[in-house]
Amino acid sequence: MTGISIGVVRRPNEADVATIRSLAEAAERADGVAPLPEQVLLHLKRSGDADADADTDAWHFVARRLSPQGSELTGYAFLDKSNAEEGPTAEVVVLPDARRQGVGGALLDALRMKVRRGDKPIRVWSHGALPAAAALAAKRGLEPVRELWVMSRPLADVPPAPTPPDGIRIATFRPGVDDEAWVEVNARAFAHHPEQGSMTVQDLRDRMAEPWFDPEGFFLAWRGAKLAGFHWTKVHDHSAYGDGPVGEVYVVGLDPAEQGHGLGRTLTEVGLRHLHDRGLGEVILYVEADNTPAVAVYTKLGFTRRSADVMYQL
């Protein structure tokens, strides 16, 4: 006899973390898209640190298939309830060989049970807008409420880096020196973006500790002593985006006072040229599907829609 068991913990143990990572890698190979975003992977990485994320209302859900031979970890979900204004968000991934066997549905049920009556509805991401996820969403009556596009372009014909606007100096990020200034401007630039705008100095330093971090690809635009904007690039050494390394416009942000003067495009082009000069052949970026002005800007810069992530509401 077999069944599904769901465990809910604040901090998964080391063995489960390793298995969850392997599960996510198997899903990425099968689907061609990473099932878990960077923030969840950082939570998993810090799970052994009792002091990390102490003020974060986050939970890990581990699904196991039970049989007379033992148990096998076949699914995982992450629930973040920290943002009271936006409501809880979740990520779900199921081992490819265990799909269409009730694991995804069991995880959704467990997520629902973790939210108190009166809380805002849970919103669940589907990365890559996969048919299996859409079928489960339709079966459970989930409604799509947000769509995030992945856009890409080749880097072969990127022009030289442009001259900055008058009064602007562009320099690379100095770890330990520019941290606080960047966090302050990032918060203002993304005041209405719950994930990006809430980043703390510790969140920044967590990313600086990752193997992919390169300050030479992190560009800051200064107006005198004041930070006006930034373009942080990233390189995926191996990923679902291609056989070789792929660049990313990781995040571009401007102080609100600097918007509308072309600085965002300048910073974007500086970063694209940097990725080109590193010998990369392609670059991607993420943009809200309903952000028509941003989509128009990126389209003019040669980007086209490659795939989409869809958020469903439970």
Swiss-Prot record:
Its EC number is 2.3.1.189. InterPro entries: Acyl_CoA_acyltransferase, Bact_Acetyltransf, GNAT_dom, Mycothiol_AcTrfase. Keywords: Acyltransferase, Repeat, Transferase. SUPFAM superfamilies: Acyl-CoA N-acyltransferases (Nat) (SSF55729). Acetyl-CoA 2 binds at residues 252-254, 259-265. 1D-myo-inositol 2-(L-cysteinylamino)-2-deoxy-alpha-D-glucopyranoside binds at residues 38, 195, 234, 248, 286. Acetyl-CoA 1 binds at residues 92-94. Belongs to the acetyltransferase family. MshD subfamily. Monomer. This is Mycothiol acetyltransferase. It comes from Catenulispora acidiphila (strain DSM 44928 / JCM 14897 / NBRC 102108 / NRRL B-24433 / ID139908). The lineage of its organism: Bacteria, Bacillati, Actinomycetota, Actinomycetes, Catenulisporales. The gene is mshD.
